[in-house]
Design a protein with these regions (language model features):
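A conserved FAD-binding loop/helix module that cradles the flavin
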Residues: 424-452
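Feature captures the FAD/FMN-dependent oxidoreductase FAD-binding
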Residues: 127, 132-136, 184-235, 333-342, ...
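FAD-site-proximal beta/loop scaffold in flavoenzymes
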Residues: 239-270, 355-428
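N-terminal Rossmann-like FAD-binding beta1-loop-alpha1 element of flavoenzymes
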Residues: 131-157, 282-290
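Glycine-rich dinucleotide-binding loop and its adjacent helix/turn
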Residues: 111-127, 185-205, 230-292, 399-410, ...
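Rossmann-like dinucleotide-binding cores of NAD(P)H-dependent redox enzymes
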Residues: 155-158, 162-192, 197, 286-333
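Ferredoxin-type iron-sulfur electron-transfer modules in oxidoreductases and energy-metabolism complexes
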Residues: 9-28, 48-81, 98-125, 253-254
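Local cysteine-cluster metal-coordination motifs and their immediate loop/turn environment
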Residues: 30-49, 74-97
């Protein structure tokens, strides 16, 4: 995939990958063997008919390819950019046995971008079936559920807590990985289908789940409110100035443009930044810090590179952009001056012991190996949990001890007519898994309402 030069892109927020040309897309699509048993489809959480859309691309029929994709996915331009295809559809590609797998994700992105560039494309709005469904949260789970239900004729309203629709797609994923204009285009397409989007609506505070159903006539509610409550390490110094959760750091950077001189919510311009964690969010935070002008940015992770949960592509991009990896190290204290600003982070070196419950080798401290990392800002990226607000205001809604909503395989919660999916159920996971949950719940909601009204 053509990309910006690392030493150029680490100073701007423009998209890293520039995408396929028509000629390259057709050439790549022609590598597909069109296998009869279609293993790639089984590797896709939303079950896109991958060989079918690739066949259309190979023949130069990009409109036909989009029609195939859109039957299964409401967010193809998003998926083509941020889904971990290398561990899903592309990992099942027969081509990958002896050579590189077909670039399924890149082809999906190409098709979606081609479609979005057309000015004469009209969305066919289905006839209303007279039933109302509320969606709480406008992230990938909520938008997917909304799109599938709208296509079935439902009157769908999405309630978003922030001032812009998109959820984690706009506040969590940086512009250089997923341009906000792409997300807005996907949201606009849903609006053309008839989906209503209400922003600045915190469900659980402005309105409750019960009020949506009892007072506003929604026959079912889907909760896709994500997992935006950050976790911390509970070590000394986490309350110092210059310590951010990755959630706050990325939201300020991506959504509020806090790095601009005229920002009403400014963010600290640090010279040396430590990002604690090894997932995709940690990579995003580190790469943002570099673009914000930090001279040195460190990823501090307590395991080895082999155990990094981030996508390999994101790790490689971070390395190319000059991010320094301090592996097998764990913070024990954040240090500050008398004005309570960060001056450093004390770490201890680790070694890997026996595997833990996750199957990864457990990191063990090496006694006497403490050292101080010279930094003036720290970003904590060790995971998130669902916000407890909906749980606290919805009687009879069962949740896990850690806060996740309990739902069955179809997304049904302990409350009749109330469904949930995505990070609100699983904890922080991938965009495509959230989309799969939204899709499954949409089918279940449709069945529930249709059976209820027989």
């Amino acid at each position: 995939m053509p990309s910006q030069d690392p030493n150029v892109r680490n100073k701007n927020f423009l998209e890293v990958a520039t995408g396929y040309t028509e000629e390259v897309a057709i050439e790549e699509a022609q590598r597909c063997l069109n296998c009869k048993h279609r293993p790639c489809v089984n590797g896709c959480p939303v079950h896109i008919a991958i060989p079918d859309f690739i066949k259309e691309v190979a023949q130069g029929n990009f409109a036909g390819a989009y029609d195939v994709i859109s039957q299964s996915s409401s967010l193809p331009a998003v998926c083509g950019r941020v889904c971990p295809q290398e561990s899903q559809c592309e990992s099942k590609c027969v081509r990958g046995i002896k050579t590189e797998p077909v670039g399924i994700g890149r082809l999906e992105r190409f098709v979606a971008d081609w479609h979005n560039a057309q000015t004469d494309v009209k969305v066919n709005k289905p006839e209303s079936n007279g039933h109302k469904v509320a969606i709480v949260g406008s992230g990938p789970a909520g938008l997917t559920c909304a799109g599938d239900l709208a296509n079935k004729g439902y009157d769908v309203t999405v309630f978003e807590a922030l001032h812009l629709a998109g959820g984690v797609l706009v506040y969590g994923i940086p512009e250089f990985r997923l341009p906000k204009s792409i997300v807005q285009k996907e949201v606009d397409t849903l609006k053309e289908l008839g989906v209503k989007v209400e922003t600045n609506m915190v469900i659980g505070r402005v309105l409750s789940i019960d009020e949506l159903m009892d007072d506003y006539g929604f026959e079912s509610v889907f909760i896709g409110s994500g997992a935006g409550l950050p976790r911390f390490m509970n070590i000394p110094g986490e309350n110092l100035c210059g310590v951010y959760s990755a959630n706050e750091f990325l939201t300020r950077t991506n959504l509020m443009k806090a790095y601009k001189d005229d920002s009403t919510t400014p963010i600290m311009h640090a010279k040396k930044v430590a990002v604690v964690g090894g997932g995709n969010v940690a990579m995003d935070a580190a790469r943002c810090a570099k673009r914000l002008g930090a001279e040195e940015v460190y990823i501090v992770y307590r395991r080895s590179e082999e155990e990094l949960p981030a996508r390999k592509e994101e790790v490689e991009h971070a390395k190319e952009e000059g991010i320094i990896f301090k592996l097998l190290n764990n913070p024990v204290e954040i240090l500050g001056n008398e004005d309570e600003f960060v001056t450093g982070m004390k770490c201890i070196k680790m070694e890997l012991g026996e595997p833990d419950a996750s199957g990864r080798r457990r990191p063990v401290e090496i006694p006497g190996s403490e050292f101080v990392l010279d930094v003036d800002a720290v970003v904590i990226s060790i995971g998130t949990s669902p916000n407890p607000l909906i749980k606290a205001t919805t009687k009879g809604l069962d949740t896990q001890k850690w806060g996740g909503i309990i739902a069955d395989e179809n997304g049904l919660t302990s409350r009749e007519g109330v469904y949930a999916g995505g990070d609100a159920v699983t904890g922080a996971a991938t965009v495509i898994l959230a989309m799969g949950a939204g899709k499954t719940a949409a089918a279940a909601i449709d069945e529930y309402i249709q059976n209820k009204n027989k």
